[in-house]
């Protein structure tokens, strides 16, 4: 059983997946920092020195000064500012993955085109299989053509 697990764990795609998960976790931290520390502060400044992560809709009748205070009190809230931050995180990650996949696809060699499976009968212009020796439509002999 141990040797079977070793074979499974050392297969190429399992190791690739493990590396991808580790790199993805590190990339997630970079994207979070990019959104929270680089993009959102200037955006908040442009719309009036607003911290997006503290935007929320209070569903209780008691007013609270901040999202943290409302959550600490157990008040029901809709934290749409955090949602906006997470949405921006997702868009950045999705765009980065798109660029990565696009580049990898460019590096892959293009497969050779498949040979045609049909040809045109020179007599009646109908489509017939490439291997046909006689046209099914006009019964012309197609072997002389080859």
Curated annotation (Swiss-Prot):
Instruction: Check the record and name the SUPFAM superfamilies matching this protein.
Output: Gated mechanosensitive channel
The transmembrane residues are: 14-34, 81-101
Query: Which Pfam families does its entry note?
Result: MscL
Q: What is its main location?
A: membrane
Cite a GO CC annotation.
Answer: plasma membrane
Query: Which HAMAP family does this entry report, sorted A to Z?
Result: MscL
- Protein source organism: Symbiobacterium thermophilum (strain DSM 24528 / JCM 14929 / IAM 14863 / T)
InterPro entries named in the record: Mechanosensitive_channel_CS, MS_channel, MSC/AndL, MscL_channel
**Record note on quaternary structure:** Homopentamer.
* Name recorded for this polypeptide: Large-conductance mechanosensitive channel
| Known role | Channel that opens in response to stretch forces in the membrane lipid bilayer. May participate in the regulation of osmotic pressure changes within the cell.
**Which Gene Ontology molecular function entries are recorded, alphabetically?**
mechanosensitive monoatomic ion channel activity
Membrane topology qualifier: Multi-pass membrane protein
Its localization reads:
Cell membrane
Q: Does the keyword Cell cycle apply?
A: no
| UniProtKB keywords | Cell membrane, Ion channel, Ion transport, Membrane, Transmembrane, Transmembrane helix, Transport
Family to which this protein belongs? Belongs to the MscL family.
